[in-house]
Every structure is written in structure tokens, then in C-alpha cells.
């Protein structure tokens, strides 16, 4: 008997609770790619990534599905780790440089892109503060994805609070951006068959 969509959704939730989560091209990361300016032939595999830190009692974590038009950089050293490939598929092109080659409107831009993430903390914040944390977390996207927030991307971040710990909003927002940068890096580094070493 074939499972209906509702049954599949329920089964997916049950499996998620069993500790089956993996970074890389699994779950929401299945089918994710990066560096898609010239279409699927020259892009690289990506996936879903996560990372969390604890400072004292404060916990901040991020999870992100990285399916971006742009290239991915290691936020710690600025080195490109995934993205638009040259025709020989042995080296990278720079998506930003390729975009700068012409200011004319590109009608057939590869538009099936979105990087969607969430940042979660055990600190207590209300809705307006969580919106600010989500906004600050976009700095993690900017450190790691270039270009980011284009009209061909649907980039978004959601912030959630699960606790009652009192913490400084600016500290948590700044830390959230760093945690998100690492989650993005882990998404591409964990994807199977994704990386070339240059």
C-alpha cells in the first residue's frame, strides 16, 4: 500500500525524533546545490548543516538548508569551498565576477534557489527581539555566501527562543551570525560528492 502524504509527513517526524539527523545532502538538504549561475551543469552539491555553541548556560544553535545561487566561502579564512565550476570542472569561477561581466538583464537566470535557516536559543526573547536576532543572523549568510540575497534567491532566517535565560540581545545576535556561518560551511563540507580541492 502506498503511503499518503500525511502518513509520510508523520513518518518523517517520527524518524526525526529518533536521532537520524545528519548534515549534508539528506532530508531538507537533498537536492541542494550552490554556484548555479550557469545552471545545474556547473554547480556543486550542497545540503543541510547545523552547529551550536554553549557559553555558560547560554545555548545558541543554527540549522540551514543551503541551496544558493552564489558560491560558499569558509567564514574563518575566506577560502571558497564550493560554488560555480569552470568548464573543466577542476577549478572555480567566481559567481560575483561573472555577474559583473554584464549589467544587462538576464532573463533565464537559474531561479530555483533558497537558503533557509533557523537560529534557536535558550535565552528569553520576545517576538520583536527575535526578529532582530534573525536580522543579525543574516550577517552569517553574507560572510559565507557570495552573492547572497539576490532576486534569484529566497533567503530567509527564523529565530526561536525556547527558554527563560536572560541574555544580551546584541551578544546573542552576533553569536547567532557566527553559528550560522559554521552551519553553512558544514552543509557543503558534509555533502557527498560535492567538493573539489583547489
Ranges and model annotations:
Residues 1-5, 198:
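Short, small-residue-biased leader/transition segments that mark boundaries at the very start
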Residues 8-20, 133, 144, 176-183, ...:
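Stable alpha-helical structural segments in soluble proteins, enriched in small hydrophobic residues
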Residues 8-75:
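Phosphate/diphosphate-binding glycine-rich loops and adjacent basic-rich segments that engage nucleotide
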Residues 20-26, 106, 143-156, 191-195:
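Flexible, glycine/charged-enriched surface loops at secondary-structure junctions
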Residues 44-55, 59, 97-107, 142-145:
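Glycine-rich, charged/polar anion/phosphate-binding loops
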Residues 63-113, 117-125, 166:
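Glycine- and Gly-Pro-enriched alpha-helical subdomains that act as flexible
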Residues 103-111, 117-152, 165-174:
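Hydrophobic alpha-helical bundle architecture
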Residues 149-150, 155-195:
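Internal helix-turn-beta structural module
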